[in-house]
Amino acid sequence: MKKAPSPLISLIPIVVLVLLLFATIRTFGSDALSGGSQVSLLTTTAICILIGMAFYKIPWKDYELAITNNIAGVATAIIILLIIGALSGIWMISGVVPTLIYYGMQIIHPSFFLASTCIICALISVMTGSSWTTIATIGIALMGIGKAQGFEDGWIAGAIISGAYFGDKISPLSETTILASSITDTPLFRHIRYMMITTIPSLIITLIIFTVAGLSHDASNTQHIAEVATALNEKFHITPWLLIVPVVTGILIARKVPSIVTLFLSTLLAGVFALIFQPELLQEISGVAVSGFDSLFNGLMMTVYGATNLHTDNTVLTDLIATRGMAGMMNTIWLILCAMCFGGAMTASGMLGSITSIFVRFMKKTVSVVGATVCSGLFLNLTTADQYISIILTGNMFRDIYAKKGYESCLLSRTTEDAVTVTSVLIPWNSCGMTQATILSVPTLVYLPYCFFNIISPLMSITVAAIGYKIARRS
C-alpha cells in the first residue's frame, strides 16, 4: 500500500494555487480568465504530480486516469455551455430577450424587483431542475430589466442566482438533488422533504433582505426606464409572437426533454424567429451591404458563434444587447478543463483525501459532524472546482461516519447540498462560478456578496445542527 502524503505536504499545491490566483487577479483584473487563471491551475497540477511521483512513487498512469475521468465527467457540461453560448446570442438578436425586458419593465415594480426576481427564478428552476438553464434564459432578461431600473449588477445577479440555486437544490428534476440522494442512499423525496428544514428559512431571510433593499431603492427615475423601452422599440421588432420561444422552451422542460435537446431546439426556433422578425439586425451584424440570403445567413451564423455589438443611442442598452455567442464560452471551457486536471491530480496523489481527513478528527457532537461536512464540502468545491465531484467525494467520505454515529443518511445528503450545491457558484474558478459569471457578464466576486441564499444555506445547516432541531437518527 502506497504511503499517502501528509496533510502539510498536501497543502503545498493549494497554497501555491491561492498565491498564483491572487497574483493573477491582482495583475490582470477582469482579464484573469483569459489565460492567467488557467496557467495557474496547470502549474499547480504539475507541482502536485511532481511531488506525488518523486516522493510517493505514484505512477503517471494513475494521474492520467484520474484526470481523463474528471474531464469525461464534464463533457456534457461543456456541450451545454457551447449551446448556452449560442442560445444567449440568438435569444438576444432574435428579439426574445428584448421582448421579455420590454414587457417585464412594465409589469415588475422597481421596489419589489429584487424579491420578484428571486421568486421567479426559484419557481422556474424548481420546474426545470436546472439553475444553468434558468440563468441563461430568464436570468438574462431579468438582468436587463434590473439594469434599466437602475440596480447595480451585483444585486441583480445575486437575486437571480439565489432564486435559481434554491430551485436547483430542491427540484426532483435537478441532477445535484438526484446525485446527493443517490450517493448517500437516501430516497429522493425523503431527501427533498428533509432539506426544507434549512432551505425554506434560508429563502425567507433572503427574500426579506431583497425586499428591504428594493424598498430602499430610488424608484422615482421612471424616465430612465422609459428611455430604455423606447430604445428597445427602435432597435428591435417587439411583438408578443416572440414569447412563443420561451413558452415552447418551458413546455419542452416540463415534458422532461433532455437539457441538450431542449437548449438546441430553443436555439433553432429563436434562429427562425430572428430571420422572420429581425432581418435588418442580421444584415447589420453581417456587414454585407446588400440584403439577401448571404447577409441573413452570415448574420445568423455570426450571432451563434461570435460576438455582436449593435449600437443604440442608449448606453445601457448598447452594453446589454452585446453578445458573445459560443466563442464567449471558450475561456470558461478552457478553465474548466484546467480545473479538472488539478482536481484529478489532487485525487490521484491522495492529497485530497489527506487534507479532508483533518476534518474527521474534530467530529464529536452533531454540530461538529455537520460542521466538518460543511467545511469538507466547501474545501472540495475550492479544490476540485466542480460541484458534482465535490458532492460525490463528500458523500463517499462521510457516509460510513454518519452511519457509525447513528445518523440517518438524509442528514448527510442535506448537509452535502447545503455545503456544496449552493456554494459552487461563489467560487471564481469553480465550473459553476465561471459559467454564471460568463452568462450574466458579472464577475463572480462582484455578485458573491449579494448571493444571500447561497451564503446563508451552509450557515443555516450548522445552526440547525447546533440547536439540535429535527436531527434524523437511526432508530
Name every feature range the model reports, one short phrase each.
Residues 1-11, 143-165, 169-246, 250, ...:
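Membrane-core helix-loop-helix motifs of multi-pass transport proteins
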Residues 1-81, 197-207, 214-338, 475:
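Hydrophobic transmembrane alpha-helices of multi-pass small-molecule transporters
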Residues 46-50, 164-169, 270-274, 400, ...:
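Alpha-helical transmembrane segments and their membrane-interface exit regions
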Residues 56-147, 306-399:
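Membrane-embedded alpha-helical segments and adjacent helix-loop junctions characteristic
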Residues 57-58, 260, 348-349, 463-475:
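Membrane-interface capping segments at transmembrane-helix boundaries
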Residues 136-142, 160, 262-270:
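Central hydrophobic cores of alpha-helical transmembrane segments
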Residues 150-152, 254-260, 385, 442-443:
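Transmembrane helix interruption/hinge and helix-loop junction motifs
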